[in-house]
């Protein structure tokens, strides 16, 4: 990592996908939640910005895992490093996906949608699918309105807490401290 920084590397985009080890195992990512935490620490220590990407909505997503993602990004001071759209992305299962080799996936997908080029699926908790749609809408509206990543994250975290039936305190002040802008790509859909 120090060599990356010394040679001018400003940031690293990493396809983390999930902080849930059972999901990471199904996706065959070859890393764990603990590995991600170590990488975050190494990046902060060397001064290279980490821009993790995620696919937070999978057939195995729970409200608890959604809340955990927001809590960890806040705790790790990664709010400004994550494009808001990354917090609403749904797993796509195209033809030929290795996921289709899993019995549990074959049982949960619908017939192939030739127009969308995917096998559609639904979460066992319809509220999780509704939350994914809501977070995508918040991200799109925030992009259109030029809201900061921090302000958008706060809206998305609030929506997630409400969807999980958690009490949300009304505050006039921001729950997140301001932070200098981090370098990032102008196309936030990388995953």
Regions found by a protein language model. Name each.
Residues 1-48, 55-76:
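Conserved non-cysteine loop/helix-boundary elements of the Radical SAM core domain that shape
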Residues 21-25, 51-55, 141, 170-175:
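Glycine- and acidic
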Residues 47-53, 69-70, 110-116, 134:
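Short acidic (Asp/Glu) and glycine-rich catalytic loops that position anionic groups and cofactors
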Residues 98-100, 104-191:
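Radical SAM enzyme core and accessory elements
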Residues 22-27, 56-65, 79-121, 126:
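Flexible glycine/acidic-rich beta-alpha junction loops that bind and position SAM and/or redox cofactors
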Residues 2, 9, 77, 82, ...:
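Homeobox/homeodomain signature
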Residues 38-50, 76-81, 130-131, 135-145:
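A structural motif corresponding to the C-terminal end of an alpha-helix
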Residues 8, 24, 36-39, 43, ...:
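Solvent-exposed, non-transmembrane amphipathic alpha-helical segments
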């Amino acid at each position: 990592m120090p060599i990356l920084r010394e040679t001018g590397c400003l940031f690293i985009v990493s396809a983390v996908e999930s902080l849930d080890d059972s999901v990471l195992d199904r996706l065959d990512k070859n890393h764990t939640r603990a590995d991600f935490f170590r990488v975050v620490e190494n990046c902060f220590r060397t001064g290279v910005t980490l821009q993790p990407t995620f696919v937070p909505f999978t057939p195995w997503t729970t409200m608890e895992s959604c809340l955990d993602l927001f809590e960890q990004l806040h705790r790790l001071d990664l709010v400004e490093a994550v494009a808001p759209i990354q917090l609403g992305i749904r797993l796509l299962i195209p033809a030929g996906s290795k996921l289709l080799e899993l019995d549990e996936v074959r049982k949960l997908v619908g017939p192939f949608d030739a127009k969308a080029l995917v096998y559609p699926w639904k979460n066992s908790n319809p509220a999780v699918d509704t939350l994914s749609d809501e977070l995508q809408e918040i991200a799109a509206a925030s992009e259109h309105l030029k809201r900061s990543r921090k302000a958008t994250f706060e809206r998305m975290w609030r929506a997630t807490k409400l969807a999980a039936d958690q009490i949300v305190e009304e505050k006039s002040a921001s729950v997140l401290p301001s932070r200098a802008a981090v370098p990032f790509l102008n196309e936030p859909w990388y995953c």
